[in-house]
C-alpha cells in the first residue's frame, strides 16, 4: 500500500512559512508523502494569509485552484480564523482551521487520508524537521502572537497575545539547524524584542547554565553557535540597546529589522505605535556609535487615515536624517476588523497614496544608492544563494533573503550555494552590489 500524498500551498509571511514547515514535518513523521502537484494527491492543504485584502484574495484564489485541480482541500492559517468568508466563496472545502492549529490540521488529514503503517527505520525525518527554505538558511520562530494593539493590525485577533517559547526549546532547535548545515538563522516572531515578557523572563537550563527567556540572553546564546544570526521584527524598546554590543563584537549580524511604520507623531499616535521619530533617530544614532557597521531595515505605511502632506513630509525628512539602509513601503489598505476603521479619520485618496508611495520610494532609492556606493572597493563576506558555475548571487551581512539587496558575483572557481566567500565590491546600483570572489 502506497503512502497517502499531500500537496501543500504556503502563503504569507515567514512566520506562516514556519507553521507550514511544522505541519509538513508532522505529516512526514507519520509517513505521508508530500506532492509538488495537486493533481494526483490525496488532498491539498492551503496555509492562508488573511492580513490585507490582497492577501485574502490570493488565499481564496489558491483555495479555488486546489479545489479545481484536486477537490479535497483543507484550509488553515490566518484566513482560517474567518471560516464564513471561506465557506461563502468555497463551500466544498473539507475542513477549516485557524493559525497555529497543528493538531486540528493533522486530525483533518487523518479523516480524509488515514496515516499509513509507520516504519521509523524507513520514514526518517531530519532532526531539525522539514524546511521549506534552502538548506543554508532557516527561520527560527521564538514566539506566537502579539500583545501590542496597533490600530491597523489584526494579528492579535488572528494569533492571540504573545506566547514565548521556552528558551531551551528554541536553542535546542537552533542547535539542530546548525548541526544540519544551516549557515544563517533568521529569528522571527511578531515582536522579537518582547520575547519572554509574557512569562516574566522565565529561567531555564541550557548546557549546564541558567539562561533567561529574554531577547538579550537569546542573542548571546545564538551568537555562540558559529553561524550568521539575523534579527527580524524588533521593536525599538530601550533594552534593544543591550544587544548592539554583540553586533559590534561580531557575535550576531549587525542588522536590525524594525517596523517603524511612520515618523509623524500624529500618525504614530493614530497607529497606536510605541515609538516617536525623535527618539528613534537618537536611538539609531546611538546604536551606530556602538556598532558603526549596523544596517537597519524597516517598513512604512503611507496614506494612513488622517495623514496630511505635512505628516508625509516629516516622514521624508526623517528618512533623510536616519539614512536607514533598507526600507519597504506599503500604501495603506483598510483591514477588516482593525481599530483604524473606527477612528473616524479622513481617508487619504488613492491617487494621493500612490503619489506618496512613489515619492517615498524615490527618496529611499536615492539614499540606498548613496550608501551602496560607499561599499565599492571593500571586501565583504557574502553567503551564496544561487550558483551557476563561476557566476552566482548572494547576500552580505546587511541583507536578508528575498526582501533586501543582492551581490552579483563572478569567480575564477566554481561557486557553491551556502558557502560564505569574500567578494571585492567593484560596482553598485540602487539596491545591489557587483563584485568578484577573491
Curated annotation (Swiss-Prot):
Catalytic activity: L-aspartate(89)-[ribosomal protein uS12]-hydrogen + (sulfur carrier)-SH + AH2 + 2 S-adenosyl-L-methionine = 3-methylsulfanyl-L-aspartate(89)-[ribosomal protein uS12]-hydrogen + (sulfur carrier)-H + 5'-deoxyadenosine + L-methionine + A + S-adenosyl-L-homocysteine + 2 H(+)
Functional summary from the UniProt entry: Catalyzes the methylthiolation of an aspartic acid residue of ribosomal protein uS12.
Key words, A-Z: 4Fe-4S, Cytoplasm, Iron, Iron-sulfur, Metal-binding, S-adenosyl-L-methionine, Transferase
Residues annotated as domain Radical SAM core: 132-370
Cofactor requirements of the protein: [4Fe-4S] cluster
CC annotations in GO: cytosol
Binding site for [4Fe-4S] cluster 1: 13, 49, 78
Domain TRAM: 373-438
Family: Belongs to the methylthiotransferase family. RimO subfamily.
Name of the protein: Ribosomal protein uS12 methylthiotransferase RimO
Boundaries of every MTTase N-terminal domain copy: 4-114
Compartments in which it is found: Cytoplasm
One example of a Gene Ontology biological process annotation: tRNA modification
Amino acid at each position: 500500500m502506497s503512502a497517502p500524498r499531500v500537496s501543500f500551498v504556503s502563503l504569507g509571511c515567514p512566520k506562516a512559512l514556519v507553521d507550514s514547515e511544522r505541519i509538513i514535518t508532522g505529516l512526514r513523521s507519520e509517513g505521508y508523502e508530500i506532492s509538488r502537484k495537486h493533481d494526483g494527491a490525496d488532498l491539498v492543504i492551503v496555509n492562508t494569509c488573511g492580513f490585507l485584502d490582497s492577501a485574502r484574495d490570493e488565499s481564496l484564489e489558491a483555495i479555488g485552484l486546489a479545489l479545481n485541480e484536486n477537490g479535497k482541500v483543507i484550509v488553515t492559517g490566518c484566513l482560517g480564523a474567518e471560516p464564513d468568508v471561506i465557506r461563502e466563496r468555497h463551500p466544498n472545502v473539507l475542513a477549516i482551521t485557524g493559525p497555529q492549529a497543528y493538531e486540528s490540521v493533522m486530525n483533518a488529514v487523518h479523516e480524509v487520508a488515514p496515516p499509513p503503517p509507520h516504519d521509523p527505520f524507513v520514514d526518517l525525518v531530519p532532526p531539525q524537521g522539514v524546511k521549506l527554505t534552502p538548506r543554508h538558511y532557516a527561520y527560527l520562530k521564538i514566539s506566537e502572537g502579539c500583545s501590542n494593539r496597533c490600530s491597523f493590525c489584526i494579528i492579535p485577533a488572528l494569533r492571540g497575545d504573545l506566547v514565548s517559547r521556552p528558551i531551551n526549546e528554541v536553542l535546542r532547535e537552533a542547535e539542530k539547524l546548525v548541526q544540519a548545515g544551516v549557515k544563517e538563522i533568521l529569528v522571527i516572531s511578531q515582536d522579537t524584542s518582547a520575547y519572554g515578557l509574557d512569562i516574566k523572563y522565565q529561567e531555564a537550563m541550557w548546557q549546564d547554565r541558567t539562561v533567561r527567556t529574554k531577547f538579550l540572553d537569546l542573542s548571546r546564546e545564538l551568537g555562540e553557535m558559529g553561524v550568521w544570526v539575523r534579527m527580524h521584527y524588533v521593536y525599538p524598546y530601550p533594552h534593544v540597546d543591550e544587544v548592539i554590543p554583540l553586533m559590534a563584537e561580531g557575535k550576531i549580524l549587525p542588522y536590525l529589522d524594525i517596523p517603524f511604520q511612520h515618523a509623524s507623531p500624529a500618525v504614530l499616535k493614530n497607529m497606536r505605535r510605541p515609538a516617536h521619530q525623535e527618539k528613534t533617530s537618537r536611538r539609531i544614532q546611538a546604536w551606530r556609535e556602538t556598532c558603526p557597521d549596523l544596517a537597519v531595515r524597516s517598513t512604512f505605511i503611507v496614506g494612513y487615515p488622517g495623514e496630511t502632506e505635512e505628516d508625509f513630509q516629516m516622514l521624508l525628512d526623517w528618512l533623510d536624517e536616519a539614512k536607514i539602509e533598507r526600507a519597504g513601503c506599503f500604501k495603506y489598505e483598510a483591514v477588516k476588523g482593525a481599530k483604524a476603521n473606527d477612528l473616524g479619520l479622513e481617508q487619504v485618496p488613492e491617487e494621493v497614496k500612490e503619489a506618496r508611495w512613489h515619492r517615498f520610494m524615490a527618496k529611499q532609492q536615492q539614499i540606498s544608492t548613496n550608501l551602496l556606493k560607499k561599499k565599492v572597493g571593500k571586501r565583504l563576506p557574502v553567503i551564496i544563494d544561487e550558483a551557476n558555475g563561476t557566476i552566482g548571487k548572494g547576500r552580505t551581512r546587511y541583507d536578508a533573503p528575498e526582501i533586501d539587496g543582492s551581490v552579483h558575483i563572478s569567480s575564477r572557481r566554481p561557486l557553491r550555494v551556502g558557502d560564505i566567500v569574500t567578494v571585492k565590491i567593484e560596482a553598485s546600483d540602487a539596491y545591489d552590489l557587483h563584485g568578484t570572489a577573491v
